[in-house]
């Protein structure tokens, strides 16, 4: 018994200072973005009372200060999220995006008077448990002294193979599947967003590390690799924005959000494990615990989104495809969809 206790202490050395910084930034990001959904929705409702609703093509919300406060809050959250990747591994930062769902659900219940059902409360609890599990067992951030080191990791055969598969699969979906199945199968648009998104997060992390080192006195801006990562970020984000908006415009958000969260987060973790070798610094118990934490978050996310379909305690099955104009006043979606979604 004493030996097993000692081995556990040896395997768990606590969180590094960088991981703590990344955790604080990620949680701050979730707080800002989760709150921004509520503020923006209040602004949209206020604007709709005096002008044309956004869901039917109106832009009166642009004259509503409350909506702009919400957008500013969301921008602060995205900046904090960007900074979090510079300090902590993607395995820690990315799953914590689910915390913003909890913030949104609770604030919607308090401020917007949107009923939070018992299963929604259970979903929030599962997200908290899963997030805590991942935080306590996340790997330490890799020590990197130059953007060249990140470039070397990105150009290793394993990650190059992964990146080639991702790009090939995304191009194949765009060319062959989008024209035929884009409007009928939700997995087409979400698949493109998730594949490209995993590469965008790796590039965002590389760019964040470069900026962190630059601000600490080691200038990384004169390395061409820094600008290559910047170009990749811009290309990937534009692609994500395009196909995510298509998905949200075509399908019900209650369907898009959980599927996208599962695929995006899973592929991002896989990309991080391959590129930064996060799991090489952990034992089997820690890895399995992290996976269990992630599955717990997924379960909570599913429950939260299912409660959107519950009216007066009865479950209503929504059609797979629904007009964005009908669904404009729907519940609070996941941060990564809404942060890229057009108003």
From Swiss-Prot:
GO terms for molecular function: magnesium ion transmembrane transporter activity. Keywords: Cell membrane, Endosome, Ion transport, Magnesium, Membrane, Transmembrane, Transmembrane helix, Transport. It is found in: Cell membrane; Early endosome. Residues 1-18, 88-90, 137-157, 211-220, 276-283 are extracellular. Residues 40-66, 112-115, 179-189, 242-254, 305-343 are cytoplasmic. The chain crosses the membrane at residues 19-39, 67-87, 91-111, 116-136, 158-178, 190-210, 221-241, 255-275, 284-304. It comes from the Eukaryota. It holds the Pfam family Mg_trans_NIPA. InterPro entries: Mg_trans_NIPA. GO terms for cellular component: early endosome; plasma membrane. It is a multi-pass membrane protein. Homodimer. Belongs to the NIPA (TC 2.A.7) family. Acts as a Mg(2+) transporter. Can also transport other divalent cations such as Fe(2+), Sr(2+), Ba(2+), Mn(2+) and Co(2+) but to a much less extent than Mg(2+). This is Probable magnesium transporter NIPA4. It comes from Arabidopsis thaliana (Mouse-ear cress).
